[in-house]
Swiss-Prot record:
This is Uncharacterized protein HI_1016. One of its GO terms (cellular component) is membrane. It is a single-pass membrane protein. Its main location: membrane. Keywords: Membrane, Transmembrane, Transmembrane helix. The keyword Ligase does not apply. The lineage of its organism: Bacteria, Pseudomonadati, Pseudomonadota, Gammaproteobacteria, Pasteurellales. It is found in: Membrane. The chain crosses the membrane at residues 75-91.
Amino acid sequence: MIRCTDINEITPFSSFISKIPNHCGTHMDASRHFVKDGLSINELPIGYFCHKDVVLLEVPKGEAEGITKEDLEPYAAILAQVSFAFLCTGFEKYRTENPLIYQNEGPYIATSAGKYLSDNYPNLKGVGIWFPCTWFAVFSCT
């Protein structure tokens, strides 16, 4: 972190520049990220990002291990009822235990899972891999 300004007689605020690698934090990919004619993030209405029916599913995964269709099939009845699903892999433990593994070898949603979800769950608007911040990690997947 680099300090840009600090509070003094001339500057009434403090600010920093933070540098972090992409995929270390929160972001969303719209369908245009993977589908040539899909909507871009700025074309989606704000309501698309608001969800009342949300689930946290436990899908344990290791280093660079994909979440597959087979991992999600046991949750079919639940997925049919929600508009957003978080997938808890247990990988958040590496955030403090081994930050390099956390940053570079995280689990991912495999093509088979993406196709399965898009083909079978039209009400599902989003899927995310649950990576809680450090202070919250002890409460995840319990």
